[in-house]
Amino acid sequence: MKEYQIHLELDRSQQHNFLYPLLFREYIYALAHDHGLNRSTIPLENGGYDNKSSSLSVKRLISRTYQRIHLSIYAKDSNPNQFIGHNNKFYSQMISEGFSVIVEIPFSLRLVAFLEGKEMAKSQNFQSIHSIFPFFENNFSHLHYVLDVLIPYPIRPEILVRTFRYWVKDASSLHLLRFFLHEYFNWNSLITPKKSNSIFSTRNPRFFLFLYNSHVYEYESIFFFLRNQSSHLRSTSSGPLFERISFYGKVEDLVQVFVNDFQDNLWLFKHPIMHYVRYQGKSVLASKDMPLLMNKWKYYLVNLWQWHFHVWSQPGRIHINHLYKDYIDFLGYLSRGRLNTLVVRSQMLENAFLIDNAMKQFETTVPIIPLIGSLTTARFCNSLGHPISKPTWADSSDSYIIDRFMRICRNLSHYHSGSSKKKSLYRIKYILRVSCVKSLVRKHKSTVRVFLKRLGSEFLEEFFTEEEHVLSLIFPRALFTSRRLYRGRVWYLDIICINDLVNHDKLEIVPN
């Protein structure tokens, strides 16, 4: 364990002392302890906040608040303990946004230094979601078992404050973070943001993402440490994860949790092949190990969450799947391995014989049932998949309705272009096409037959030919190549976020 301590100690020169305590001085402590702040109401101009979240603007806002306390106290304040009033959402939002911008600075600098040290190419393709699936195809085809993991969230806000304390030795920032979490933060909204009206989940996405990423970053640092110490091959992409304060103490806690058998049990995991992929709160751990060893990893993860993060995680949140029998639901695709038998005729001297060669492939398909469920939620069809009209768009122009439906089809086709089977995608396009027709018919108070007869049968053919038309523009001199790519699998490296209908969190697709 001594060599681990030497390896994991944080260099004093890399500790970052934040600049904003010098700017805010005693105002941060006033925010955290002076309840007279709760009675201040400052009229703020309306507008966006992205261009107003600098440290200077936040300092001015806090200064005005601090001075306003001593000038006016409203006796009719019905809730003196509530910092955020009905008209102060922009006020608190601005402070939290400025806090998020400032605390992100040292971590972004650390990432840039790590990329420069590793001499990695800063390509935008690395940010594409679709780049994960070629990685699956190249590395998962020879593996056997997969751990499908849902990362649990901490229930108590103080856990995030403690996690943040491992990174930054700055009391004022901890006071401010604790104030945000305890005074006006609805913690249930962080756990289930899609069902919440909390301003942090809906109007402060930067602050929400910072807290969430800090939690996941802490979890993955310990996980990669265990993985690297249990493997013959060391990971080359987890270098910055080891820059931790008191990391040696964490390892000692893990040793106590695992009944002082840390070194005795790690030999069970020694295998050079293990891959880890995560997007948001879902991760995939693939290995060539047998089910017994995968159960060991499941045991270690559950105990890590329970004893270090104080999060009770049911074992059902971690599923052990066979790569060639079960599907992996990840990023809106159902993925699994498949064995294809290829018969080859060979001849040796005068005797001819057949050889059956089994070729391993990794296929990805479109999950039709979840997509229809998303279309049902968005009011494009009913629960049986029958298209219905979109009454909320009835007041819009015909060109707007058609353009809106075509953008949805284009986005779905673009996102699911890597599917091995396109028939499910054709059904989704059919639902949207008929829903578009019914929406126009509802607007004009006509019938489907009369409407299509008036516009022609080729009116909605673009719903099926849009993606092929795009590929024909990319390959203008090879029409056969563009059609083959349209029917085949294409991974686009310009997709940096998951599709809204696939993500099941939003009801509308935002036009590009």
UniProtKB/Swiss-Prot annotation:
It is found in: Plastid, Chloroplast. It comes from the Eukaryota. GO terms for cellular component: chloroplast. GO terms for biological process: mRNA processing; RNA splicing; tRNA processing. One of its GO terms (molecular function) is RNA binding. Keywords: Chloroplast, mRNA processing, Plastid, RNA-binding, tRNA processing. It holds the Pfam family Intron_maturas2. The keyword Chloroplast applies. The keyword Plastid applies. Belongs to the intron maturase 2 family. MatK subfamily. PANTHER family: MATURASE K. Usually encoded in the trnK tRNA gene intron. Probably assists in splicing its own and other chloroplast group II introns. This is Maturase K. It comes from Acer platanoides. The gene is matK.
